[in-house]
Amino acid sequence: MDGTKILADANKYSFVWRKNTIRFDKLNRSAIISLLEELNEAKFKCQLPAETDLTLEMLDEIILRLENNLKDLNKKIEKEHNSPNPDKSRRRKLKSLKRKLKLRQTKLLEYKIQTGIYGKRNSYSKTDHDATFMRVKEDSMLNGQLKPAYNLQIATSKQFVTAFGIFQNP
């Protein structure tokens, strides 16, 4: 049995690490919770049950309710022509929170997709999802740089190749 690492045809600086995805996902979820608290302070009721994991469907529902509320506010503002209209500042605040929630929702979807791509690995390349980052022998600067690669295992018997396999793990 002989093994060698073959470089993938992928950009060596296009890596995605599992630990970073998990860390950024936690930060994103805490930011979403703080945005929902801001919505509650703006008198927009969007209570989440305690110890509930945020899902994309929950955020879709909240954003849809927020858009409907904004439509109602727009109609109310068009009817009333008060100069210092408090509804305008409320609308401004709700629009800002809706935009931020949509941004966080896209990030949540991105992290969910990344977690699905990982499988059992700890890294993958953005340009070649099957490649895993490994240390390879062709390291010209001898600094232990990681590059996207595949692990090729070859089984031989009396100098004849009997089997081979390409794996993602080093």
What are these regions (language model features)?
Residues M1-P170:
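Polybasic low-complexity intrinsically disordered regions
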